[in-house]
Amino acid sequence: MDPRKVSELRAFVKMCRQDPSVLHTEEMRFLREWVESMGGKVPPATHKAKSEENTKEEKRDKTTEDNIKTEEPSSEESDLEIDNEGVIEADTDAPQEMGDENAEITEAMMDEANEKKGAAIDALNDGELQKAIDLFTDAIKLNPRLAILYAKRASVFVKLQKPNAAIRDCDRAIEINPDSAQPYKWRGKAHRLLGHWEEAARDLALACKLDYDEDASAMLREVQPRAQKIAEHRRKYERKREEREIKERIERVKKAREEHEKAQREEEARRQSGSQFGSFPGGFPGGMPGNFPGGMPGMGGAMPGMAGMPGLNEILSDPEVLAAMQDPEVMVAFQDVAQNPSNMSKYQNNPKVMNLISKLSAKFGGHS
């Protein structure tokens, strides 16, 4: 398994231990069902932790969208302009009461909750929004497992322009009944107030799919173009980034190949130099002119006409030649003569130099 995936899984498990409410989101429903099917038990979510997680998620979404708008400002792909008319500042009120989902509910409590619900709807129709909130909260505390109560209270929070509170209620309603259209509708409207265009479009589209609503459809038509613009911008940005990464990868491969080929050429040059000059210190600069005693015809300059020359192995097999080649004084004199044969007269009285020249002349002369 990919080590990165294992690391991500380990981090996810750690997060779940710290905040079990992560497992109670709709996205994690499949994981809860699997854990329970294996005989495990998913710990109950704390509403405080859940609310904090929702707030963090909203901040992450907003940060992601802001990053898309601000990253690489010099690039054409960062030029994203969105009409944010109607977007408001996020509410920061303390999380609302959600009731005890593990409480034992009696029929009397359910009846009383229905009465509170009816009174809340009447208050809502009369424009008494805060009173409606209070009555819906009373109903929720009496029957905390009824999804419609959270959805109704969320609708009032939207009217009060408290989108984060509305989102918390909708999240809870969806956990209880993910097939109800109302929570998606009001959560979509709350996201629209926050400028979360993609989230708003997803929720409103799902609400219309579950139970078509003209009001939700009208808002979907408003937010969808902006959501599509953001999605297209993201795809364009990711495509540019992928192209840039591919280009950089190609450049790295090209550079590595060039360095490898350069190293091969240098190695080949060293190998050829070694085979040409063997162990001769300093080589034979300027070639070996044909003015050695005994004659070395055709060997001026770059040493043409070498078909009759003895091999270096044969020359170096002579111990006296090899010893002379290791003598710095002899090699300096030899190179001096090789570059300018007329300088040989300077070494007429040097037996070591003349001995080497005589031996080489004899060897080359014998193979001419």
UniProtKB/Swiss-Prot annotation:
Its main location: cytoplasm. One of its GO terms (cellular component) is cytoplasm. Residues 38-81, 256-299 are annotated as: Disordered. Residues 318-357 form the STI1 domain. One HIP oligomer binds the ATPase domains of at least two HSC70 molecules dependent on activation of the HSC70 ATPase by HSP40. Stabilizes the ADP state of HSC70 that has a high affinity for substrate protein. Through its own chaperone activity, it may contribute to the interaction of HSC70 with various target proteins. Homotetramer. Interacts with HSC70 as well as DNAJ homologs and HSP90. Interacts (via the C-terminus 302- 318 AA) with GRK5. This is Hsc70-interacting protein.
